[in-house]
């Protein structure tokens, strides 16, 4: 079964996120558990935690289908060890917040070399940071998101993701999230059936479907291999509906959260319906 939702607002408190997901007909969602553009935030109150759990139950959404996203400030590959430690500490704080909400996973961008160090050194930094976080936390799965390769961001090749997964110290707590816009803009085509199968077969061989823990479903304003991260509404970009039809009919992608981050939240409910209608037999 496919579980579809969107990255919904937690404005006014994280307890609002399940209600916002329910309002668009979602059975999965993503959220920020703190302000994504600030290093620190007020602690979650007992009242807010309780309200989140109550609203989640009322929305009838499983914890397994929630994919929180951590701060955009975090850079686990930072060339400066002190800045890297700042990112690690911020990551651990976000895990603590997720634990309070009983969340099972946290999604993150791997990191950036900032054009100051070699890509391989940056990957090694990211890997070491991931392992430190795994060793100093418990339970929650760390879900690495692929990137478009914009600027100096790592994670735009399956080989990057495969390296980080292979070198993680706890394979039960590591996963991968594929963002379709990032995938397409980093050079992996999914538009035709044959292109999709080639791309996903490569993913299976290099990373492994057993590590696929979620997807971000976004069309792209920019063309194949553009290395630019510009999301578009489904069917209105360079990927088109055919790519999403391929995803919705791939049984290897069942039972994980499929999250919209498309640019017009006023049509998220329509996009969710459209995605479900792409499933053959529906």
Curated annotation (Swiss-Prot):
The keyword Zinc applies. SMART domains: AP2Ec. It catalyses: Endonucleolytic cleavage to 5'-phosphooligonucleotide end-products. Keywords: DNA damage, DNA repair, Endonuclease, Hydrolase, Metal-binding, Nuclease, Zinc. Signal peptide: none annotated. Zn(2+) 3 binds at residues 182, 229, 231. Its cofactor is Zn(2+). Zn(2+) 2 binds at residues 145, 179, 216, 261. One of its GO terms (molecular function) is phosphoric diester hydrolase activity. It comes from the Bacteria. Gene3D superfamilies: Divalent-metal-dependent TIM barrel enzymes. Its EC number is 3.1.21.2. The keyword Mitochondrion does not apply. Binds 3 Zn(2+) ions. PROSITE patterns: AP_NUCLEASE_F2_2 (PS00730), AP_NUCLEASE_F2_3 (PS00731), AP_NUCLEASE_F2_4 (PS51432). It is an enzyme of class 3 (hydrolase). GO terms for biological process: base-excision repair. Zn(2+) 1 binds at residues 69, 109, 145. Endonuclease IV plays a role in DNA repair. It cleaves phosphodiester bonds at apurinic or apyrimidinic (AP) sites, generating a 3'-hydroxyl group and a 5'-terminal sugar phosphate. Belongs to the AP endonuclease 2 family. This is Probable endonuclease 4. It comes from Campylobacter fetus subsp. fetus (strain 82-40). The lineage of its organism: Bacteria, Pseudomonadati, Campylobacterota, Epsilonproteobacteria, Campylobacterales. The gene is nfo.
């Amino acid at each position: 079964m496919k579980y579809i939702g969107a990255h919904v607002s937690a404005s006014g408190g994280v307890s609002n996120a399940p209600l916002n997901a329910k309002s668009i007909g979602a059975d999965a969602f993503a959220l920020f558990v703190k302000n994504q553009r600030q290093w620190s935030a007020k602690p979650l109150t007992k009242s807010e935690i309780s309200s989140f759990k109550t609203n989640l139950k009322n929305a009838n959404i499983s914890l397994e289908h929630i994919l929180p996203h951590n701060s955009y400030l975090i850079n686990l590959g930072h060339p400066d060890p002190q800045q890297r430690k700042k990112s690690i500490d911020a990551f651990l704080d976000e895990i603590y917040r997720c634990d309070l909400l009983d969340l099972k996973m946290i999604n993150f961008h791997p990191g950036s070399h900032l054009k100051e160090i070699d890509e391989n050194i940056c990957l090694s930094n990211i890997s070491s940071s991931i392992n430190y976080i795994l060793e100093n936390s418990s339970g929650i799965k760390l879900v690495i998101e692929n990137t478009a390769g914009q600027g100096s961001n790592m994670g735009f090749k399956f080989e990057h993701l495969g390296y980080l997964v292979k070198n993680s110290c706890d394979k039960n707590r590591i996963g991968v999230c594929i963002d379709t816009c990032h995938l397409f803009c980093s050079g992996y085509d999914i538009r035709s059936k044959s292109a999709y199968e080639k791309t996903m077969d490569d993913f299976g061989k290099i990373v492994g479907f057993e590590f696929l823990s979620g997807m971000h479903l976004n069309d792209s304003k920019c063309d194949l291999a553009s290395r630019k991260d510009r999301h578009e509404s489904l069917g209105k970009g360079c990927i088109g509906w055919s790519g999403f039809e391929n995803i919705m009919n791939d049984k290897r992608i069942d039972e994980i959260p499929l999250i919209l981050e498309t640019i017009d939240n006023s049509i998220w409910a329509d996009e969710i319906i459209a995605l479900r209608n792409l499933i053959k037999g529906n």
